């Protein structure tokens, strides 16, 4: 959520920057009028309460002097009836303001490229050497089905499209990737490992910015105010909702493994084949809570941590900065890591690393104090894929395939797999 004071004091700049995300935000000028009306009503309430206190003192004095105070009592009663009406009006104004603020996306950072969609994204780095095959390359679906490690037909029978059954060494490979990612982030990069709930409530979804915009993408549990977790970002950010963090505890960084669930309501017809875009998928997520002055460095560190997974797997990738029109709703700046997939002969997203600054912290009311007597401030929150497990599995299968259809296990995964080849 954006700061109302900042919006009203910098309205032209805010509208200009939000417009780069797509759409017209000129209607935000009405927030200035609403804010002024709010201040006026608050002053009116405060003035009436001050008068009520004065009259109460006057009544006390009159009674001590054994004089008639009925005329002053009438004034107090009049004020008592006026204040609730004004407080009701104030509540209505606050509701109007909150309805505007809750649907506003985050303001893009100054160095984010301006553009309407992914075509304006800017590549800033490439890593690794793309392998040149001397045989016809297969995609992960062909490889997985031929090796009997991915079963799409039975998954569709069990549930429906966009699901898969991992079998045998396929299941072991997915588990190996999860453990390898968590071990690397926990032991090498210093993140604290957590396994949060896979079910979250309505407040948690609003706090991180999933709601209201992406409500159609969520799976709701009928009869409950609960939703299946769309990303570990949601439960992990909400660990500190409505809390004040000790300054000495910052920065806080977690690595969280969850299964994620998404309806993919806006993705009809896209990536329907294979495990690239599914309703249920495993994901290792990185989360940081940082002081405002430290969040940019925290963002760079998180990006490097996520990149390290692919470097250790020795799989080519590139990093792009997302444009204003391609960024997520609650993010101020996002890097995408795109892995090379020989089966598609292109780079595909395998993880996003984002800085939300104080946007989520305001929605979730997550604050910190620099000292005992200091005023509270909002923390900055950051999140990143570390990585999407299914897409990493695709990258391993396609980049490490052999002419006979077998898959060579990357060196770093051999201790987890117990075999050197899937065949």
From Swiss-Prot:
GO cellular component, one term: cytoplasm
Keywords: Aminoacyl-tRNA synthetase, ATP-binding, Cytoplasm, Ligase, Nucleotide-binding, Protein biosynthesis
Principal subcellular localisation of the protein: cytoplasm
EC number: 6.1.1.11
Binding residues for L-serine: 231-233, 285, 385
Enzyme class: ligase
Record Pfam families: Seryl_tRNA_N, tRNA-synt_2b
Pathway linked to the protein: Aminoacyl-tRNA biosynthesis; selenocysteinyl-tRNA(Sec) biosynthesis; L-seryl-tRNA(Sec) from L-serine and tRNA(Sec): step 1/1
InterPro entries named among the record's database cross-references: aa-tRNA-synt_IIb, aa-tRNA-synth_II, aa-tRNA-synth_II/BPL/LPL, Ser-tRNA-ligase_type_1, Ser-tRNA-synth_1_N, SerRS_1_N_sf, SerRS_core, tRNA-bd_arm
Bilayer-crossing regions: none
GO terms for biological process, alphabetical: selenocysteine biosynthetic process; seryl-tRNA aminoacylation
Catalyses which reaction(s): tRNA(Ser) + L-serine + ATP = L-seryl-tRNA(Ser) + AMP + diphosphate + H(+); tRNA(Sec) + L-serine + ATP = L-seryl-tRNA(Sec) + AMP + diphosphate + H(+)
Localization per record: Cytoplasm
Molecular function as annotated in GO: ATP binding; serine-tRNA ligase activity
Protein residues bound to ATP: 262-264, 349-352
Biological function: Catalyzes the attachment of serine to tRNA(Ser). Is also able to aminoacylate tRNA(Sec) with serine, to form the misacylated tRNA L-seryl-tRNA(Sec), which will be further converted into selenocysteinyl-tRNA(Sec).
NCBIfam families in alphabetical order: serS (TIGR00414)
Comment text on domains: Consists of two distinct domains, a catalytic core and a N-terminal extension that is involved in tRNA binding.
Subunit-structure text: Homodimer. The tRNA molecule binds across the dimer.
Record family assignment: Belongs to the class-II aminoacyl-tRNA synthetase family. Type-1 seryl-tRNA synthetase subfamily.
HAMAP family named in the record: Ser_tRNA_synth_type1 (MF_00176)
Descriptive protein name: Serine--tRNA ligase
Provenance organism: Acholeplasma laidlawii (strain PG-8A)
Lineage per the UniProt record: Bacteria, Bacillati, Mycoplasmatota, Mollicutes, Acholeplasmatales
